[in-house]
Design a protein with these regions (language model features):
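Aromatic- and Gly/Pro-rich donor/ligand-binding loops
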Residues: 1-135, 144, 180-182
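A nucleotide-sugar donor-handling region in carbohydrate enzymes
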Residues: 135-182
Length: 182
């Protein structure tokens, strides 16, 4: 049986329950389907162990290509949450931290899109969300980045509307329940 190597992008380097939960749910679902897979977690900063006692290594997104060259990823899954924008913000990485770092959450979907294009790797969106319509300047860029997505699911109709306003075909975008409920 083939073992699938899957890269996951999300905010695994921040103590955030939902983002840390999805790889566990995914792994269990694959196991029930008889699919053997190895998960590689990537985040904007990375170089930490995943929280909540899971102890999986979280790699920085800039190492995505390097690890693909070594492990040959079969797919990249972009995690959910409010990531569909081009902004960064100041973020505490854990509850004991006192230092705010510049956290480029947009990298969790932009870098995988470029990577998938360059490497012809399957790209799957797992329910990311948007907060506001993109400025005119960003709409063509967003449309180009989304052409590499093989399966695009978003968390709500509002996010779907944001993407269709970028001329992404509505029939390519699926609105689904949070995957924690699958």
């Amino acid at each position: 049986m083939k073992k699938y190597n899957i890269a996951f992008t999300g905010v695994f380097d921040i103590e955030n329950y939902g983002d840390h939960l999805f790889p566990l749910i995914f792994r269990e679902k694959m196991k029930k389907k008889g699919i053997d897979c190895e998960l590689f977690l990537f985040s904007p900063i990375g170089d930490v162990q995943q929280g909540y006692q899971q102890n999986y290594e979280v790699y920085p997104l800039y190492k995505l290509q390097e690890l693909h060259d070594r492990y040959h990823f079969d797919a990249v899954i972009v995690g959910g949450g409010g990531i569909l924008h081009y902004a960064s913000g100041k973020q505490l990485l854990d509850k004991n931290s006192t230092e705010f770092v510049d956290y480029k959450v947009f990298e969790t979907w932009v870098i995988p899109s470029l990577f998938a294009y360059n490497n012809k790797v399957k790209l799957i969106w797992n329910l990311p969300g948007g907060f506001h319509e993109f400025d005119y300047f960003y709409k063509p860029l967003t449309r180009c980045l989304c052409t590499t997505v093989d399966y695009m699911s978003v968390r709500d109709q509002y996010t779907k509307d944001i993407l269709t306003s970028c001329n992404i075909p509505a029939d390519k975008i699926y609105t689904c329940l949070d995957s924690a409920f699958i």
